[in-house]
Amino acid sequence: MFYSHLLFFTFTFACSSSLNRKTKREMDLKDIILDTCHQNAACAHIQMHLKETYVDELCKCGRGEECPIHWDPNDGHSITQAYNQWKFCSPISQDLPVCTREQTAREFSYEMNPVSKKVQMFMFFNCLCPENHFYEFFNEREETGGGQLAIIEERCEKVKQCEKTQICQKIETFQGKFLFKHVKCFCPGNQNCNDDLKKADATNVGDDGSVQHYMKCH
């Protein structure tokens, strides 16, 4: 099945005809194509951890426009939620409605480029998840026409309160640089989820050299 799942803070791409799940960093360059953005598609995703940011470019702007890949919630080209920011080639409406529980919040369109025969993903927002919610996969539609392979749909799911000793977030670094954070739950009461990598409750080194830092509430 052609499937890709984005949990609020991590991108996973289904790429090429093999339809294997790989992170963008794990793909060979021949598997990746940054095509011209469709209208209203996000051109980049930025995450901030303390003062460090990581940029994941999603597509290229056309008509002489550039994707504004610097953190700026006031540039008129951004949707900002917590330490996530999505960028757009053209000014984006700041009046997107808050999603209802049953509404499709975000869509990913996977398409085959007719020239290169490589897969490109485009991301579209229909509405914004409310505070303490994340974007969660709920439906996949396989397509057969117009070069489109599949559409992934996400809804808003509430982030649950952490249980005692539960990991509240995972932060990944590569060669000492921040890549992304994945929040798993929110800390109760006056507790906060640890952000200090030096005080991680556990770490794991991946085959590609990336390091996962597992944090608990303190």
From Swiss-Prot:
Disulfide bonds: none
Primary localization: secreted
Modifications after synthesis and translation: Contains 8 disulfide bonds.
GO cellular component, one term: extracellular region
Segment forming the signal sequence: 1-16
Tissues with expression: Expressed by the venom gland.
Domain of life: Eukaryota
Propeptide: 17-25
Record has Transmembrane helix as a keyword: no
Record GO terms (molecular function): potassium channel regulator activity; toxin activity
Cell compartment(s), UniProt: Secreted
Keywords: Cleavage on pair of basic residues, Disulfide bond, Ion channel impairing toxin, Potassium channel impairing toxin, Secreted, Signal, Toxin, Voltage-gated potassium channel impairing toxin
Family the entry assigns: Belongs to the scoloptoxin-11 family.
Function: Voltage-gated potassium channel inhibitor.
Official protein name in the record: Kappa-scoloptoxin(11)-Ssd1b
Organism of this sequence: Scolopendra dehaani (Thai centipede)
